[in-house]
Amino acid sequence: IDIIQNIPLLHPIEVFDNIRLIHELDIGALKLVSAADRGTQKDFGDLLLLCGLYSLERLHSELLKRESMFTGKEFGTIFNVEGLPSGLARDLSALGNFNRATDRKSESNRLILTESATIPRSWPELDQRWTGMVEAYARSKGLRFSPPSRKRKWKNKGLGL
């Protein structure tokens, strides 16, 4: 089974034990788009792991390079049928939208880390580290970063809430 399907890549595919693997830099660029679009806990966790290997600046640069080469309907994929740019060239605000990431009803939105994980094991700490990283990068490059306000979940604690 080949799981790499019609996604244009910047880097050669690596083969390990007869399994084709997408290069980490291609994954990083695609994860930025995924985090901006759907923003699951797994997306943000994966990005923090990738930023342990490559800087956020490098991943963002790879994304911009991808979008300069692969924009248009002929480069559409199952994730982006029209092949449109992500909108992350000058505005990184979508990378701070955690409103969907806190919805734990969906199994695909849960990040379960092992004891040896190199990223924060609590969601609030992971959220804070990622936001700080994006904010610092945006400021250093003169990019916009103004994430939407967070949805507040009120719990009934007998106080009329």
Predicted regions mapped to residue ranges:
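Structured mid-to-C-terminal alpha-helical surface segments
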Residues: I1-G39, G45, G52-L161
